[in-house]
């Protein structure tokens, strides 16, 4: 139980381990549980940051953007740093003032093509017309957030065809996050070669490699 639950329930865990009459032992065990639980949670946070800010995601996002020059594109990152790192188009995040954010959205709404890079601020509520491509670089296990992000792109507008790219680092916990957040969704899994085919208008080869459950890895 040395983890998030261990941290929350560390007093109860201490009581299971220690003799009720030994105040000194109880204090030492409590401190030890707190130390290890905190270290575990910091490691989990570092793992998530490593996955969310992986440079390969930036590389693939830029490739998609460059291969869709006539599209209106939205990208979703899990943090401002990642959104700013894409380096193509405008950035819309919670760092902006309300006035600047409103102007950014109005200008983008009036464009036929372009890129807007966002994080949580555009998950819901914003009305953006004409989107045809979504690139999701940062994800978690939330099915609600996944549906909201897709909803930004899949809005019926004439005969519009929308593309949604979820960039997932294989053999990491992110594959499990993706599976949990897309339980009721239809999707195809492709590798980078398959992505190149899609971007060139070709039918991608099925990704047949078994996705392993490496929950203990980054």
Which functions belong to the PLM regions below?
Residues 1-68:
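Interdomain helical connector at the RecA1-RecA2 junction of SF1/SF2 helicase-like NTPases
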Residues 81, 122-123, 139-142, 154-155, ...:
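Conserved nucleotide-binding/hydrolysis micro-motifs of P-loop NTPases
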């Amino acid at each position: 139980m040395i983890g998030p639950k261990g941290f929350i329930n560390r007093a109860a865990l201490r009581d299971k381990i220690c003799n009720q009459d030994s105040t000194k032992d109880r204090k030492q065990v409590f401190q030890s549980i707190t130390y290890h639980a905190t270290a575990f949670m910091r490691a989990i946070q570092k793992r998530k940051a490593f996955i969310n800010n992986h440079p390969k995601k930036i590389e693939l996002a830029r490739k998609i953007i460059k291969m869709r020059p006539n599209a209106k594109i939205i990208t979703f990152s899990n943090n401002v740093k990642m959104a700013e790192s894409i380096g193509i188009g405008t950035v819309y995040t919670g760092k902006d003032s309300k006035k600047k954010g409103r102007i950014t959205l109005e200008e983008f709404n009036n464009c036929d093509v372009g890129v807007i890079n966002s994080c949580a601020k555009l998950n819901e509520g914003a009305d953006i017309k004409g989107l045809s491509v979504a690139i999701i670089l940062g994800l978690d296990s939330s099915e609600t957030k996944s549906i909201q992000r897709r909803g930004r792109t899949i809005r019926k507008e004439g005969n519009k065809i929308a593309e949604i790219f979820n960039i997932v680092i294989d053999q990491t916990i992110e594959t499990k996050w993706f599976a949990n957040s897309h339980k009721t969704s239809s999707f195809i899994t492709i590798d980078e070669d398959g992505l190149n085919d899609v971007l060139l208008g070709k039918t991608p080869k099925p990704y047949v490699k078994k996705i392993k459950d490496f929950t203990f890895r980054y």
